[in-house]
Structure formats: structure tokens, C-alpha cells
Amino acid sequence: MSEGRTFLSQLNVFNKENYQFSSSTTKKEVSNSTVDADNGASDFEAGQQFATELDQGEKQLGILSCIGLICNRMLGTGVFAVSSTIYTLCGSVGLALIMWAVGAIIAISGLYVYMEFGTAIPKNGGEKNYLEAIFRKPKFFITCMYAAYIFFLGWAAGNSINTAIMFLTAADTEVTKWNQRGIGVAVVFFAFLINSLNVKIGLYLQNILGIFKIGIVLFISITGWVALGGGLKDGYQSHNFRNAFEGTETATAYGIVNALYSVIWSFVGYSNVNYALGEVKNPVRTLKIAGPTSMVFLAIIYIFVNIAYFAVVPKDKLISSKLILAADFFDIVFGGQAKRAAAALVGLSALGNVLSVIFSQGRIIQQLGREGVLPFSNFFASSKPFNSPMVGLFQHFIVCTVTILAPPPGDAYLLVQNLISYPMNIINFAISAGLLWIYWQRRQGKIEWNPPIKAGVFVTGFFTLSNLYLIIAPYVPPSNGESVYSSMPYWIHCVIAWGIFFFGGVYYVVWAQLLPRWGHYKLVSKDVLGEDGFWRVKIAKVYDDTIGDVDTQEDGVIETNIIEHYKSEQEKSL
């Protein structure tokens, strides 16, 4: 009956042989009889309920691996590069620290929203799965919007620029608009090349550089406490905590929201495990431990690092340091040579983040190609010639290059930061508001929704309102001279973000409406279980003159069409 159906009853997943389908689905519950170590079902606990079929591929990621995925993605250059900007916008040490605490609370609430969706739909794909589950009509519309969001944003560009600035500082070379651009492009190209030619070497570099990140932030934190205790040379202290809230009155609504954007930029990555949940051992237990552990650890470390900055760096230097605050911190504590060494280490940390981001983005582009969403899908789905998503990686390299070269050099890092954060807030608002709608539907008895981890109405509502504020507030005009950009309008990142989503809407009209009408076919989709054991959506064209009216055909005819389409595309992409 309709009131007893699961929320995801239209996702069409089932079992056959190598390629498996279903035209209807019921609640998936792991029973005691199915928990068998031999068939891999021991990755789930008896009695757990899921709103989708479970991936059957190899489970490789445990708790420590998932903690590493989150920390390596979150700990990029944010805490090294944005603290100066946050202090400048807030006007005081106390308010700046409060912004870091507020950002951490927003990120933790977001983590629990993603954990709820992740334990309801423990499959690879992250927010794409959740958006498609919430916004089922018009079909393919939200998929096109999400594809545009992924395709046109240069996620790795900001940290590539920061890597360039850090390496130039380490070399004691003046940073100019062209050398930072040139090295920034070279950094992205290096990341593209490594991840394309040898995936194992790329992962090895990411892990090694991840150790550098943890070591740097721990060392800065300890040094800060030593400074507060008067343990530096000649008992030096900055005395920034004598009146911690002095200057708070200069903060504006525009400054607060942009400071919060910078903080949230530093927490991007808390949902990183959701992209690979199909490969996680016992995803419910793993998320319960890995998610909160990573977030609490990094939130505390971020606060300690900022306390260290304020304990050592005088206020005038805090304002002028911009992206090289960490290097100036080491300069004050240990001298000029330490500044150059610190800049090199922070540059390596940024490089590790670039490697991690382009690694993930290339695979998302490849997956969109495999599903059939992108034009020239076979091209983007290909793993030739090095068994890597080289085309997807190259696409992200091109977008990052344009993002690095297009804006004025002084504004490039902040533009990328805001250009990533703003549309991400739109996505997060849609997901959290959708979860509130699910709660309402469940309360009305219209759907079943009982994932193992629940964020709850209060946490989800807080995350929804936080993102709504972050969507609206950037339109408040800044006071004179307060704009975060020196050569561009303060609203430029908002316009670009909405333009990208608008393009996704236009693509939907052309790809999913006009072309099928002109070509006399319909786009149909099924969740397909491939030979690798992982479920993925497959979109295929079903021509009217081949099988008649698609809406009246039995599922077997359509499934046969998709299977053949899926097999042929797999063969072409190998």
C-alpha cells in the first residue's frame, strides 16, 4: 500500500545475475540469518534497516581509513591561510575565536545530517544520491543541476594558488601576479599527471603529506601554549588576550558572514566518507566513530592553532599577513630561516590537499559519464590508457586553470574559497530542508524512514537555518573598503554560483526534454549492480520506434535495453 512504502521506493533496485534490477523496492533489513562472514554481510549488524539495496563490492575502508579520509580532506590550507582574513573581518581576537567555534558547530550539525542520509543509503556517491532521493520530479532535473555544480567548479584551484605562494615564500622570492599563477597551474598539472599515470603513487603522496599536516598543526598548537606560558625567547608575548574583544564594534554583518565563510572553508570535507560508503566496512558503526572523532579532533586543533597565532603574532601583523600567517608565526618564534621552512611545509600541506581533491573530483566526473548524464559519456567514462579516470582528471585541470588565470591574482584565492562555499551552502540547504520534509512525511505516516543514525529535528533545523543565512547574507553590501575583493564586486561569487546552477537547468531542458522529443526516444534509468559489486544509476535512451510506448512496456524490455547499453559502454571505457 502507498502509505507503507519506503521513501526510496522509486529508486528501482533489485537482484538478477551480473546486472540486477527492480521495478519496486521494500525496506532492506539485515536479519540474523543474513549476517554471514563468508558472504560479506557481516559488514552490517542484525536488525539494521536501509532504504536501498546494499553494495556487494569489496569492503576496504575501516575506521582508521575513514578518519584519514576526513582529516586529509579537511586539513588543507584553511587554518594556515584564512585566520588573518577572519581576524580582520571580525575586528577582535575574541570574536574571531567565536567564529571558529560557530563554524565547528555548523560543521558538526552538517556531519550528522550526512550521517543520517549515509546510513539510510550506504552507497558510493554522497550528496548526489541524497538529492536524487529527495527531488524525484522532474526526473533528471536535480541530476543536471548537480552535474553542473561538479563540472564547472575548480575545487583544487584555491589550494594550488596557496601552494604557489608558500613555495615562493620558502624560496624567498617576491610573489607576483604571474609567478603565483604559473606555479599554481603547474601544481594542478602535477596533481593531474600523478593521479593519471600511477594511482598508487598519488595515494602514497597523499598519505605522506597528510602526516606533514598533522605534525604542523600539532607543533603550532604546542608552541602557542608555550608562548602563553612565557616560554618564548626573552619571555615574548603579543598580549592580544588582554582585551580579547577590543575592536568587536567594528565588525559588520558583511564581515561576519564572510568570516564564517572562511571558517566553513576550513571544515569542508566532513562528508568525504559518504562518497565511498559502499566500500566501508560496517558503515553504520564506522560513521558513528570516524565522523565525530575526526570533527571533534580537528575542531579543537583549529581553535588551538588560532590561539597560538594570537599568542605570538601582533595585531598589525595579523592583518597584513594574509595567506602567509603561519610562515610569519614561525618567523617571530624561530627567525627568518624557520619562516622559509614553515612556508615549505605549509606548501606541501596544500599540495597534499590538491592531490586529494583532484583525485576525488576526477572520479565524480567519471561516474557522471558512466551514468550517461554528461555529453560524450563514453569519453568521460573511460579509464584508458592507465586504468585511471584520466579524462575526468584532465577536465578538472582545465577548469582549475581557468579559475586560476581568470580573476585578478590578489582575489583569486578568496574567490575560489567563496565560489566553492556558496553553492555548497545551497546544496546543504536543499539536503537538510529535504530531511526536514522527510521527518514531516514520516510523522504523517506517509513514508517509512528509520536509518540507524538520526540527526533529529533540532540539529537538522539548525543546519538548515545556518545555510539559509549563509545563502542570503552575502547580498548585504559591505561598508566602504570592507569588501573581501580588491578588484571585483562583492557579490561576484554569488552570481557565478547561480549562473552555474542556471546552466544545469538549461542543460536539463535540452538533454532531458528537447532532444528526446526531437529524437523520438525517452530517457530511462535503473540502478544497475555491475560485476564489481557496486550499484550505480544507468541512464539510457529507449527509442519509441523500437519498443513502442515506454510507459506501457514491461520492465524486462527496458532492462534488456539498459543492460546492453551498459555492457557496451563498459567495454568502450575499459
UniProtKB/Swiss-Prot annotation:
<feature type="topological domain" description="Extracellular">
    <location>
        <begin position="83"/>
        <end position="92"/>
    </location>
</feature>
<feature type="topological domain" description="Cytoplasmic">
    <location>
        <begin position="512"/>
        <end position="574"/>
    </location>
</feature>
<dbReference type="GO" id="GO:0000324">
    <property type="term" value="C:fungal-type vacuole"/>
</dbReference>
<dbReference type="GO" id="GO:0000102">
    <property type="term" value="F:L-methionine secondary active transmembrane transporter activity"/>
</dbReference>
<keyword id="KW-0597">Phosphoprotein</keyword>
<dbReference type="GO" id="GO:1903692">
    <property type="term" value="P:methionine import across plasma membrane"/>
</dbReference>
<keyword id="KW-1017">Isopeptide bond</keyword>
<keyword id="KW-1133">Transmembrane helix</keyword>
<feature type="transmembrane region" description="Helical">
    <location>
        <begin position="141"/>
        <end position="161"/>
    </location>
</feature>
<dbReference type="GO" id="GO:0005886">
    <property type="term" value="C:plasma membrane"/>
</dbReference>
<feature type="topological domain" description="Cytoplasmic">
    <location>
        <begin position="204"/>
        <end position="207"/>
    </location>
</feature>
<dbReference type="InterPro" id="IPR050598">
    <property type="entry name" value="AminoAcid_Transporter"/>
</dbReference>
<dbReference type="GO" id="GO:0042883">
    <property type="term" value="P:cysteine transport"/>
</dbReference>
<feature type="transmembrane region" description="Helical">
    <location>
        <begin position="456"/>
        <end position="476"/>
    </location>
</feature>
<feature type="transmembrane region" description="Helical">
    <location>
        <begin position="491"/>
        <end position="511"/>
    </location>
</feature>
<feature type="topological domain" description="Cytoplasmic">
    <location>
        <begin position="1"/>
        <end position="61"/>
    </location>
</feature>
<dbReference type="GO" id="GO:0015179">
    <property type="term" value="F:L-amino acid transmembrane transporter activity"/>
</dbReference>
<feature type="transmembrane region" description="Helical">
    <location>
        <begin position="62"/>
        <end position="82"/>
    </location>
</feature>
<feature type="topological domain" description="Extracellular">
    <location>
        <begin position="229"/>
        <end position="293"/>
    </location>
</feature>
<protein>
    <recommendedName>
        <fullName>High-affinity methionine permease</fullName>
    </recommendedName>
</protein>
<feature type="cross-link" description="Glycyl lysine isopeptide (Lys-Gly) (interchain with G-Cter in ubiquitin)">
    <location>
        <position position="28"/>
    </location>
</feature>
<keyword id="KW-0472">Membrane</keyword>
<feature type="transmembrane region" description="Helical">
    <location>
        <begin position="341"/>
        <end position="361"/>
    </location>
</feature>
<feature type="transmembrane region" description="Helical">
    <location>
        <begin position="294"/>
        <end position="314"/>
    </location>
</feature>
<feature type="topological domain" description="Cytoplasmic">
    <location>
        <begin position="315"/>
        <end position="340"/>
    </location>
</feature>
<dbReference type="GO" id="GO:0000101">
    <property type="term" value="P:sulfur amino acid transport"/>
</dbReference>
<feature type="modified residue" description="Phosphothreonine">
    <location>
        <position position="552"/>
    </location>
</feature>
<keyword id="KW-0813">Transport</keyword>
<dbReference type="GO" id="GO:0003333">
    <property type="term" value="P:amino acid transmembrane transport"/>
</dbReference>
<feature type="topological domain" description="Cytoplasmic">
    <location>
        <begin position="440"/>
        <end position="455"/>
    </location>
</feature>
<comment type="function">
    <text>High affinity permease for methionine.</text>
</comment>
<dbReference type="InterPro" id="IPR002293">
    <property type="entry name" value="AA/rel_permease1"/>
</dbReference>
<keyword id="KW-0812">Transmembrane</keyword>
<feature type="topological domain" description="Extracellular">
    <location>
        <begin position="477"/>
        <end position="490"/>
    </location>
</feature>
<feature type="transmembrane region" description="Helical">
    <location>
        <begin position="419"/>
        <end position="439"/>
    </location>
</feature>
<keyword id="KW-0029">Amino-acid transport</keyword>
<comment type="similarity">
    <text>To yeast low affinity methionine permease (MUP3).</text>
</comment>
<dbReference type="GO" id="GO:0071944">
    <property type="term" value="C:cell periphery"/>
</dbReference>
<keyword id="KW-0832">Ubl conjugation</keyword>
<feature type="transmembrane region" description="Helical">
    <location>
        <begin position="93"/>
        <end position="113"/>
    </location>
</feature>
<dbReference type="GO" id="GO:0015821">
    <property type="term" value="P:methionine transport"/>
</dbReference>
<feature type="topological domain" description="Cytoplasmic">
    <location>
        <begin position="114"/>
        <end position="140"/>
    </location>
</feature>
